[in-house]
Every structure is written in structure tokens, then in C-alpha cells.
Amino acid sequence: MMIEYLLGLLILIFPSVLAWGFIEVLDCQRVLTVLEKLPLAYLFGLGIVAWEMLVLQLLGKPFSPLWLLTPLLGASILFSAVYMRRKRHLKAKPQSQSPWLKEHWSKVDIFLLTGIGLELGFAFTRALLLPMEDFDAVTNWGLKAKAIYLANGIPLGFLTNREYATVHADYPLLLPLVESYVYFLLGHINDFAVKWIFPLSLTACVTAFYAGLRRMTLNRTAGLAFAFVLVSIPHLVFSATNAYADILIATYFGAGFFYLFLWIRQRNDLFLGLSALLTGMAGLTKSEGMVLCLVNLVVLMWAVNRERSVDRPHGWRQVLIYIGVFSTVLMPWLVFRLSMKAQNDYIHELRVERVVQWETVMRMKTILYHYQAQFFNLKSWNLLWLAALGLFLFRFKKILQSDQKFIFLATAMTLSFYTSVYFITFNDVAWHLKTSFSRLLVHFVPLVVLGFASAYLDSAQKD
């Protein structure tokens, strides 16, 4: 069993090595630190595997170790060659050597880092010891992964068979594809070997978050404090142990927004490119990811529209490039989905009369009840939502006058869309809220904590 665990980890590390080379090629000016490259390599590695498998499916090639590894090895050699060629002409910049690690470590820093380590350790322990047992982990993501492995490809007949009502053929396939990739290289199905994906995603989320805060000029202690706030949220940690896709989409969306927010503040085009790639991968992960792509795009358009008129044409060109990048990431999935004529359950069942009827309006009472039940659930969320409400009420004007308004816009748009689903759902709304709302909140938890950190930074700079 231990060997299977280690093999599963090594199989997931391999595409991360390839992604590291890809990041080195992108980072031609040596801007990123090692601490930033590590989570990016992991996240891009998963995305590259899913993207490659979708392309193989469209080309009619079977999923086998040979077909899976050959393109990855070829791309790895290509990226390495480009990187080595550039390295001879570039001098290393000081910031690329992670100067943050050389700072003095105070007792508070060590305490916070220990706390973060304990929370992550709990996530790894729980994820790796418990089997896949939660409903969607077994009947949706895990079932699709096993079907892909057994069929040596994505089985259209299985996905579109209405008898398998829990499958949701229209759901993006990043997670099932990555799980099946592990199965293919292992040579058999092993649910424990793929469970590395989830605590590693939480680790990547926290690391990318901390690195983003340091880029915003927060000192180490403050950065670690907010990273600890993020990783100490019980339901976020739980989502990294139950084999659901929510921790993945939270990480992709969160990291994509972090780099978009850094671009707004610093105007480094590398950050905008990273944001576009990560945002596109969020769209490959869950259906909600398509909306999250739109959220980041709206934030970018608003930021560009605020620029001086002389800079605005260049800004709109960057918007078009941003759309082009995340559309390239999404294209194989969109083409495949179109080819199998999959329909979204909610859109397919949506009727105008359902939206305008009085019963729909009366759902507000049920929705508000379940919202407050989550927001006051300190056991699952600590004081996160109450603190967020307090911050919004007491700093409303300052939020609108600073870059924090972009965080508020992204959070408000995401919550508004998710709320609209409960108004139009054809399921019993109370049941739907009980089974999904807590998971949807996970998606923008990193943005809320980023709002706290940004408010603290603005206050500290004024003082």
C-alpha cells in the first residue's frame, strides 16, 4: 500500500516537472521566486495532463502510457531547450532567488508556520487514510475516472446515458482525467493513490496565497498570519480531504484572481498571463468555472476602463489577449462537449414561467435561512463571514476608493450567480441548499481572506 501511495505521488509530480519548464519559459525576465513556481508547477501540471488528454480524445488516440507520456516528454525537452538557450543570455535577478527565505525568523513566524504545517498535515492524513466515500466523489468524479480508464478514452455512451443520472455529462473533466491518468500509469485502479490531488491542491492554494501577499509588500509575519487564517478554516480543509473538485476550482480561481489583482496593482504582463492560464483551468474543472472565467474577465475590463484614455487602447488589447489565452485552455473541452451534445441540467430545464412565478420569489425566505445558517456556522467557517460583513460595513467607502473594490466585485458577482441558481433550480430548494451551498462558498474563500489582507495592508501603509 505504501508503494502505491508513493507511486501515485510520483506520477503527479512528473507533469509538475514539465510545467516547471513551461513556467521558466514564460518567466523570461526571472520575476518569479521558487516559492511562487512550486504551486504554479503543480497546478499547471494537472491542467496540462487534462488538456493533453482532451486533445488526444479529439484526435481519436487511445489513452495509454505511451500516448500519455510521449507528448509530455517531448514538451519537457522543448521547454528545457528554450530555457537553457535563454539562460545563456540572461543574468539572474536577485528577486528570483527567493530573498523572503533569508529574512530573520521570529518566534511568531515559527509559531504561525507550525500552525500552517499542522493544518496541512491534518488534511494529508485525513485524505490519505480515508477511502473515497462522499457521494459525488464516488458517483460523479470517481465513476467518470474509472470509466475513462476502463474504456481507454472518454466513453461518450456512458456520459450521455440518461440512466446514469448522477454523472452530469456537461461537467468539465479535469479531475476525472487526472485521476484516470494516475490509473493508467499505475496500471490499475487505486482510489488512495489519486487522493494526493486534494491536499496538494490546498497546499498550492496556501502557498500561492502567501506568495501573492509578499508581492503586495506584506511582511513575513503578516503574510503567514493571513495564510494561517486561510488554512485554519475547517470547511476549506475538509474540502481538501473528500475527493470533491471544489478545492481544485477554489485554488485555480483564487490563484487566477491573485495574479490578476497583482497585475492591477503592478502592471506586470507576466501576472496577467498567469491569471489567464489559471482562470482557464478553473473552467476545465467544474461548470461553475465558466462563470468564474467571466468574473475575472469583468474585473479586468473594469480595471482597464479606469485607465487614462491614452493607455486604454493598450489595455483593451490586453483584454483580448487574456480572452485568447483562457479560450485556448478551454477550447479542447468546449469542442469535445459540443461534439457529444451535452446539455446543462439547469439551462435545459429552465422555463420563463418558472422564473417569473410567485413561488420563485418566495424561495428567498428559504435561501436567506440557509445562508445565515452557513454564515453563523462558526464550527465550519470560524468568524470568516461575520468578519467579512463587518469589514464591508465599516470600510465601505474606503473599499470603493481603493483596489479592494475589485475583490468586492469578484466576490459579489460569484455569490450573486450562485444565488440565482437556487431561484431557478428544478430541485427542492431546501435540499439543494443543504447539499451544495457550503461547497460553493469554498470557491471564493481565498478572495475573502485576500480582502482582509488588502485592507490590513492599506491601513498599515497609511499609518
Name each model-derived stretch.
Residues S180, A204-L213, A373-F408, A412, ...:
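Hydrophobic, aromatic-rich transmembrane alpha-helices
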Residues K102-K107, R214-A222, R267-D269, R306-L320, ...:
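Membrane-interface helix-loop-helix junctions at transmembrane boundaries of multi-pass membrane enzymes
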Residues A75-R85, A193-M216, A255:
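Transmembrane-helix motifs of polytopic, lipid-linked glycan transferases
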Residues M1-W100:
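Membrane-embedded, hydrophobic transmembrane alpha-helices
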